[in-house]
Swiss-Prot record:
Stated name of the protein: Large ribosomal subunit protein eL8
Species of the source: Metallosphaera sedula (strain ATCC 51363 / DSM 5348 / JCM 9185 / NBRC 15509 / TH2)
GO CC annotations on file: cytoplasm; ribonucleoprotein complex; ribosome
Function: Multifunctional RNA-binding protein that recognizes the K-turn motif in ribosomal RNA, the RNA component of RNase P, box H/ACA, box C/D and box C'/D' sRNAs.
InterPro entries with a match to the protein in the record: eL8/uL1-like, Ribosomal_eL30-like_sf, Ribosomal_eL8/eL30/eS12/Gad45, Ribosomal_eL8/Nhp2, Ribosomal_eL8_arc
């Protein structure tokens, strides 16, 4: 299946897993925002440290505004394969199209590694 139009770079599966791990640790010991609307607000306010966007969102327009907004605000973002993965990492029973990490808590090391690898993938630091 072709990648949706809003997916601007490929993320290796192990890096997507690390991003979800950072989200889970941030949920337990730090601060996160769940869902597209909350993630959008966190980006606009400059609070987000990393934004996770699911690749299986339909319709695409729900999250299509996130990558350009993150780039404008210079906030790193990463794609993960499924909404279900983001939802589970957030402690939800349902999927979430996007989530933002505001405070990584004990997941700071994992978050820093993910951000470093994302900047290598995108060529931005």
């Amino acid at each position: 299946m072709a990648k949706p139009s809003y997916v601007k770079f490929d993320v290796p599966p192990e890096l997507a897993e690390k991003a979800l791990e950072a989200l889970k640790k941030a949920k337990e010991t730090g601060k996160i925002r769940k869902g597209t609307n909350e993630a959008t607000k966190a980006i606009e306010r400059g609070q987000a440290k990393l934004v996770l966007i699911a690749e299986d969102v339909q319709p695409e327009e729900i999250v299509a505004h996130l990558p350009p907004l993150c780039e404008e605000k210079k906030i790193p973002y990463i794609y993960v394969p499924t909404k279900k993965g983001i939802g589970e990492a957030c402690g939800l029973q349902v999927g979430a199209a996007a989530a933002a990490i505001l405070d990584p808590g004990q997941g700071k090391d994992v978050l820093d590694e993910v951000i470093k690898r994302v900047s290598e993938l995108t060529g931005k630091s």
